[in-house]
Amino acid sequence: MTLRDSCTTSLKGGPRRFPLRNFSLFTFCKQRNNNKNDKIHLFMYCT
């Protein structure tokens, strides 16, 4: 799956992937990983 239809979230006990349809509010956060490469994190909140 891609960020287009799913996301990685740290909610509910750890990193997991959820379909976008389970969430209605989301924001993108750009962080740097240990390799100093830009990595996109999609944080979503269930409503």
Swiss-Prot record:
It comes from the Eukaryota. This is Putative uncharacterized protein YBR103C-A.
